[in-house]
């Protein structure tokens, strides 16, 4: 019989999965930490992963169930946690945050599966962006990947994915003002 999930305030998101996996005392029993996501939570997590996958020029559309999304998220954050635990900590730097780890060049993909996100290392990356990617944390993941490349002095081209009318709606939204609201 499986243990009851720990109830946390607010929706489950990739960041909350990460926080749970980062706690050594809780990491042993991920099923207890994460529990089953609601339909809304599964949809949000899917949007986050889809946005990140588009950034890598890949698709996660074949993944249909919430369980599969959670599994991918776990794999991704296990990789992040391994890097996080290997980092030297000082009082000045503290523990690396999720945002910092997403920028780490050692974080190359969500999973070894071919269809998962890869952090674009090419000199020029084309990020395919759909309307769903402009909402919530999915958009912030895209922004983080974009910022990382800008700091490395690499060219990033944002392309709308979908119909012609999406093109004008998507590209202006990536101005910095959009993210400060």
Regions found by a protein language model. Give the residues of each.
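A short, basic N-terminal segment
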Residues: 1-33, 38, 48-58
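Acidic/glycine-enriched edge-of-secondary-structure segments
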Residues: 2-9, 95-106
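Short loop/turn segments at strand-loop or loop-helix junctions that form parts
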Residues: 35-36, 97-100, 127-131
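Hydrophobic, aromatic-lined core segments that form the binding pocket/scaffold
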Residues: 88-91, 96
């Amino acid at each position: 019989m499986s243990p009851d999930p720990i109830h946390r305030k607010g929706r489950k998101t990739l960041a909350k999965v990460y926080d749970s996996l980062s706690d050594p005392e809780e990491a042993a029993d991920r099923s207890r930490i994460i529990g089953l996501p609601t339909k809304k939570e599964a949809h949000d997590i899917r949007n986050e992963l889809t946005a990140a996958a588009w950034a890598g020029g890949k698709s996660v559309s074949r993944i249909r169930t919430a369980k599969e999304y959670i599994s991918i998220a776990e794999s991704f954050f296990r990789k992040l946690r391994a890097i996080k635990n290997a980092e030297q900590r000082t009082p000045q730097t503290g523990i690396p945050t999720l945002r910092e780890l997403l920028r780490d060049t050692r974080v190359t993909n969500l999973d070894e599966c071919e269809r998962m996100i890869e952090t674009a290392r090419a000199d020029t990356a084309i990020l395919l962006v759909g309307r769903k990617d402009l909402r919530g944390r999915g958009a912030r993941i895209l922004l983080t990947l974009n910022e990382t490349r800008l700091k490395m002095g690499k060219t990033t081209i944002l392309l709308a994915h979908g119909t012609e009318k999406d093109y004008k709606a998507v590209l202006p939204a990536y101005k910095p003002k959009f993210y400060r609201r």
